[in-house]
Design a protein with these regions (language model features):
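Alpha/propeptide regions of enzymes that mature by internal proteolysis
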Residues: 1-302
């Protein structure tokens, strides 16, 4: 798998193109650099009109034969024109007790319900222990209606199961772009989708990793490493009609192995907004910009 990560056998990432981002990434520059985190996908591409899917994130891995303690967690909404189920109890309890699913807007319900059914199918004594509050799972969304037949309800139970099962075999290298829930997404008038990165906390043995499903932003505001790329592109394009006026959404899931409590994770989730702003996001009124942060460090049996 290490050889497959080399340029030529995978799509180049921003750092491969010498874009000078700050900080030191982890080994895989992905949310999976936080120990135990696993990610899976189900990608649905059919004909000319179906471009959608499901992304799964397991905070403590996919081995349900052992007890998995909940993770301390919290969340923040920069702009709330979106959906993330299960967050009322997460807020009150401070616990994340299920995997996280990300999909398209009209498929939140099937994802939420199918996750519960998936756990019931695997309902031996240990996985039932891991079902503490999994009846209120986390399922989030962004709208893929520009590239996908969003009202065709193409995500089915088997696709949710596939995303959950795929996390067992996908390994630490996380696919990006046109994959999983990100399949039909676009940002800043470019094709977008699923993205991930990580950073090592300076002078401390901690890692912060994120996974995003990006579907937001206007091209004229796109900023990369401090450079107003969007404005430059609009000046040189012959057809600079801007399709996206800023509507859209972004879901950000942040994982860390730093020992943080729920009120501290609230502060971390809130500060994701600053990163969105540096990229050119403005939290427009039609946008659903919702962020969840969790820590894998603290072990607590409830």
């Amino acid at each position: 798998m290490g050889e497959a990560e080399k340029i030529g056998t995978r799509k180049p990432r921003a750092r491969d193109l010498c874009i000078p981002f700050d900080g030191t990434p982890g080994k895989y520059n992905a949310i999976t650099d936080v120990g135990g985190v696993e990610v899976g996908f189900s990608t649905i591409i059919q004909g000319d009109s179906v471009r959608t899917g499901v992304t799964s994130i397991f905070p403590r891995g996919t081995d349900l034969t052992i007890y998995q303690p909940p993770c301390f967690a919290n969340w923040f909404s920069l702009n709330g024109n979106g959906e993330m189920t299960g967050i009322h109890w997460l807020t009150e309890s401070g616990f994340l007790t299920s995997p996280i699913l990300i999909t398209s807007t009209n498929n939140v319900g099937i994802c939420r319900d199918s996750m519960i059914k998936w756990f019931l199918i695997k309902s031996d004594s240990n996985s039932m222990i891991n079902m503490v509050d999994v009846g209120l799972p986390i399922a989030a969304e962004t709208w893929d209606g520009y590239l996908n037949d969003a009202y065709g309800f193409h995500v089915k139970e088997e696709h949710v199961f596939e995303a959950l099962e795929n996390a067992k075999v996908s390994g630490p290298f996380v696919q990006e772009g046109n994959v999983g829930g990100g399949t039909g997404m676009r940002s800043f008038d470019f094709k977008a989708g699923t993205g991930t990165s990580s950073r090592i906390v300076e002078d401390l043995n901690y890692t912060v990793g994120v996974l995003v499903q990006a579907n937001f932003g206007s091209k004229k505001l796109l900023t990369i490493a401090g450079v107003p790329v969007g404005k430059e592109l609009l000046q040189i394009e012959t057809n600079n009609t801007v399709q996206n006026k800023g509507a859209g959404s972004i879901i950000v899931i942040l994982a860390t192995d730093a020992p943080l409590l729920p009120h501290q994770l609230k502060r971390v989730a809130t500060r994701i907004s600053l990163g969105i702003g540096r990229l050119g996001g403005t939290g427009d009124d039609p946008s659903g910009d919702i962020f969840l942060a969790f820590s894998t460090a603290n072990i607590s049996r409830v």
